[in-house]
Amino acid sequence: SNALDKGGENFKRLYNDSDATQRNANGQTRSGLYSLFIPMEWNYEGYIDTYGFPVFDTPEKPVEGPDGELITQGVIEYWNNEVDGLKSDQDGLNEFYRQFPRTTKHAFRDESKQSLFNLTKIYEQIDFNEDLKNSIQVTQGSFQWENGVKDTKVVFVPNKSGRFRVSWVPPVHLQNKRYLKNGTNHPGNEHCGAFGCDSYDISGTVDSRGSNGSLHGLTKFSMEDVPSNMFFLEYIARPQTAEIFFEDVLMACVFYGMPILVENNKPRLLYHFKRRGYRGYSMNRPDKKYNKLSITERELGGIPNSSEDIKQAHAAAIETYVESFVGLKESGYGDMFFQRTLEDWAKFNINNRTKHDASISSGLALMACNKHRYAPGAPRQKPVALDLGIKKYDNKGNTSKIIS
């Protein structure tokens, strides 16, 4: 099958537009076609009996195939054994899933050579989330000002058409925690986590396919009753106006009481925060000291996306998180439950970041929670001098002496 950027993405869109369960009043799907997916176990050579039926499970007695050969193993057991044998080869495993898919997720995987991150771990997490689809505690909803009065308290309202997806809500005593400093609101739970945001400035686009606004919330280790290193909020949407998006982001920050790191190449969101009295929520770029910031950066906060160093640090932050907290670990599976973000990580291209809104904002959240790593003058790990056991001698005179 083709890579997503070589026709695979178009076919995936056609397949999704042909879902027979999503039809209009005239009984038509969006494409006018019906999609059909046949898993590999239904027609895998060597595992079909003489009557043409697939041998799914390992039979108690050998089953005869159409060529007279005996079938002693079920095709599903065979497939699982192949998967187990490729666990240490992430590229080979990914290609096996693509060529012999048992789910549509397998069939529409991208080529692993295109991916910057560990695809095995990402798809392990995606498959785990798929299996637990009905039991994962991800709630869709909206944030609202209490009684509609701005700058009071924010409440979360579950709503099937809401733009937010949330997997954790702080205990009541941590909600809406903020304090005033120099006449500006500051977050009260900065020690618990942070947000990252990829914003946009223009309300509409000509083809209605402009990039989405994206927001991610991430916790960090703290002594509070808060899960550590967990993405708890995902927002990937483009409301009718940019102002709605700005207010959505502001309400999320106020509700969780956490600061936010925003790309400052599109500054309208940052101006919105400052105008509303929440400049204290907008983080300054962590890689520069305050006296080295530009006038605009001091006024608004935020971080540029044009620097190559920032791009590399951003990608490295996601890579480290995937290796440590995504997929199967010794203690079980990771608690990254947002499928759209995982899928965006899987196809992230550092040289063409425009389409990857979810990756941008999630990476900024990771940088915000680990800002000490990017601080100028942060301690660098010095290379350790190795003692090879070779001594130096002073050979002057009749007797050698050890120098070191």
For each of these PLM feature ranges, what is it?
Residues 12-13, 163-168, 289-299:
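Short, charged, low-hydrophobicity "junction" segments
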Residues 1-10, 23-32, 44-285, 324-404:
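RNase H-like, metal-dependent nuclease domains and their acidic two-metal-ion catalytic environment used
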Residues 282-328:
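Short alpha-helix plus adjacent loop in nuclease-associated cores
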